[in-house]
Amino acid sequence: MMSGAAALLATGLPAEAAPLDPGQCWRFWRARFVQPDGRVVDDLQNATSHSEGQGYGLLLAQAHGDERTFRNIEEWTDHNLAIRQDNLMAWQWIPRRRDNIDDWHNATDGDLFRAWALLRAARDSGWWEYRDKAIAIARDISALCLAPDPRAPGELLLKPGAESRATPERVLFNPSYIMSRALRELGYAADDDRLIRAADHGETVLAELSRESVMPDWIDVTPGGFDAPQEHELRSSYDALRIPLYLSWSGRNGNPAVSHVLDRLESAGAPGKLAVSVDAAGGLRDLSDHAGYLAILALGRCGPLPEITTQDTAQSYYPATLQLLAHLANREQRHC
């Protein structure tokens, strides 16, 4: 009898679903989501662009050796999102409006992935002109996006934004922003111990959260422990899907947060479906059979990742992107 994971990962693809190699996967993704000027488009968010997508696009272009697309994405990002007085980005760009940006606040995960992609471009691809910008962004993440943990003021929490709520009594925290490999590599490159400490403590907080009923998208950290966030609904949903991806990519597959999220995914009770969203009590809210989410399950369970096929290229931006990132993580970090 197959385990739950094995049953979910059995593809059953039709004959016309031809497998794609990594280069083909990248070209399909680029054709669907990257405009010629370098703007990465989220098709399910009214064709908006956001700092997360620009950061992911940079990372994927670098990983696939596509310098031209990398340059286009970075130039568009620099001209359209890097409007703040620091080195961080406004988080969202809305098309078909006179003022494309109506919220100048940043989203730290977008800045983190942009900085990491720029660092990798210089260090691994030899595109040296991007290193200084990577270091500048990393130092502003350190200076503006870290806050003391109210439970242990000597430890640092990664804030979801530079202006996010952070007081000695309550700090807003998004567990899915902890990409510890990126934080550590940027910390070493920038000679900034604060980023490395934030990576270490972030992994500790994720392990602590695995003792909660659900792994939350958002949570408040208080002197007495974890509490429902003031600005967001308490749930485990599409944000939290990234936690096992990032931990596995960072070589931390043994962190209990990985199995906590994957167990939730496998709780759907419907063949071939994943529970991609549950409420605070674990009640099912949304199911999906998208290959991108199945790839995260396979990565976290240390199984072989299903091949990406032509059928998968019809996915929307988010699962399509997570699928490519999961395969990249699998190539870069043998975590099991």
Regions found by a protein language model. Name each.
Residues 1-17:
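N-terminal export signals
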Residues 17-42, 280-287, 318-320, 324, ...:
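Charged, low-complexity, intrinsically disordered terminal regions
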Residues 20, 48-51, 108-109, 129-320, ...:
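Extended ligand-binding clefts on enzyme/binding-domain cores
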Residues 26-105:
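N-terminal carbohydrate-binding/catalytic regions of secreted carbohydrate-active enzymes
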Residues 50, 54, 101-125:
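Aromatic-rich carbohydrate-recognition surfaces in CAZymes
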Residues 58-63, 116-123, 181-185, 245-249, ...:
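Short glycine/serine- and small hydrophobic-enriched flexible loop segments
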Residues 68-71, 128, 132:
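Short, solvent-exposed positions on alpha-helices
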